[in-house]
Amino acid sequence: MHFARLNDPNRDIAPYIDLLEAISGDVRNRIGSLSAQSRDEDGRAVVDLIVQAMQDVIPGHYQFQGDAENYDDIANADLMSVIDRKRGLPVALALLYVHVAKRCQIEITGIDFPGHFLLRLQSGGARRMIDPFHGGITLGSAELRELLKAFQGLDAELQPAHYREASDIAILLRLQNNIKVRAIRRGELA
């Protein structure tokens, strides 16, 4: 939030932090509700339950989603604008998921996938790749291969480097770089 406030230092970030806390609480409650309905303690079922809870709350109840229509709009990379508009870039939406997951003690990492930022959620030895831009859907190897080919051409194949974890700093830098690129395109930076 502090990075987003750089464009408007007088802007109060408290309502944004409060909203993130509310979303975190709702995800935590949804996990509890889904857990009570499920008797399966298998790690695979647990990770799917967590994914379902996040999908129900973040893109479901709060309606956060990718902005495919105005993808290059600078507002899609400004975290406060993303929260206001409920639309954003994959990396901006990923920050929301990461914050919520960490508040709920869920193991999640950003994945610096070529051309499209993703998330990896882990629980009980099971993993899921999540696309925050498209409603938090999970992507299997076939979908990841298709996504890679869309960005790198038909000859591209999945490599271990495509699953490279992005540090919190790398995620923030990627978001800031998106803002910079969009500002340059608009002629705001020389």
Model feature map: region roles:
Residues 1-190:
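A structural boundary/capping signal
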